[in-house]
Amino acid sequence: MKQKVVSIGDINVANDLPFVLFGGMNVLESRDLAMRICEHYVTVTQKLGIPYVFKASFDKANRSSIHSYRGPGLEEGMKIFQELKQTFGVKIITDVHEPSQAQPVADVVDVIQLPAFLARQTDLVEAMAKTGAVINVKKPQFVSPGQMGNIVDKFKEGGNEKVILCDRGANFGYDNLVVDMLGFSIMKKVSGNSPVIFDVTHALQCRDPFGAASGGRRAQVTELARAGMAVGLAGLFIEAHPDPEHAKCDGPSALPLAKLEPFLKQMKAIDDLVKGFEELDTSK
């Protein structure tokens, strides 16, 4: 079955092409740390031959606690992104939370991301669609895979069909997430075979019911990522940090930066194997 290709500059993203890595840090903690993390990702992905897009947030507007670190903000964040692009020649993905942010962010980065908690907000979707940028839609934890076609349709109505879908788990009772591996193929089907990627970092979140920040299951990142890659996906979304225990956001789910290369070697091996298989239709 023909898969839709979404191009991020010279990077082609599709379910039947070699996977693209969307990776970096959860939030911009500082200019220097962003440079360090980006350089490491670029070095490793170039060595392994993996297409790469750097990820970081300039503002985490959905933190659990009013006291949690949010990021440097729009103006300073865009300056850091511009420096990363100039220094490393890297493509960049970041999220927007308000319609007014869409165009200023799209003027700097290569992919703008619709956060899971906001994925049904039509005004935000319309503003993002109008930019003409490549869009990454995070599937809300409370939305079934089959409902993602409606969100894609909103972007199409806004004149933008350059849409990537991203699964980051589904609510499983209170304060826990699980990943439905059957959901990936459903998301492909309802979106006209748009690229589907897997955010393994945020799928590992597991909250303390009474805590002010998300917990996580970093020790299980490799197992969960292996399972997702075995489905046959367009890309993998992974955040890493040189010192996860002291990261300002989602450290418990972050991959230790020093483990990035061996981790990606495994992901590439699985991706190469799965995409070497002939398509097998078992529906009839």
Swiss-Prot record:
HAMAP family: KDO8P_synth. Its main location: cytoplasm. GO terms for molecular function: 3-deoxy-8-phosphooctulonate synthase activity. Keywords: Cytoplasm, Lipopolysaccharide biosynthesis, Transferase. Belongs to the KdsA family. InterPro entries: Aldolase_TIM (IPR013785), DAHP1/KDSA (IPR006218), KDO8P_synthase (IPR006269). Gene3D superfamilies: Aldolase class I (3.20.20.70). It is found in: Cytoplasm. Pathway: Carbohydrate biosynthesis; 3-deoxy-D-manno-octulosonate biosynthesis; 3-deoxy-D-manno-octulosonate from D-ribulose 5-phosphate: step 2/3; Bacterial outer membrane biogenesis; lipopolysaccharide biosynthesis. This is 2-dehydro-3-deoxyphosphooctonate aldolase. PANTHER family: PHOSPHO-2-DEHYDRO-3-DEOXYHEPTONATE ALDOLASE (PTHR21057). GO terms for biological process: keto-3-deoxy-D-manno-octulosonic acid biosynthetic process. The keyword Cytoplasm applies. It holds the Pfam family DAHP_synth_1. GO terms for cellular component: cytoplasm. The keyword Transferase applies. It catalyses: D-arabinose 5-phosphate + phosphoenolpyruvate + H2O = 3-deoxy-alpha-D-manno-2-octulosonate-8-phosphate + phosphate. Its EC number is 2.5.1.55.
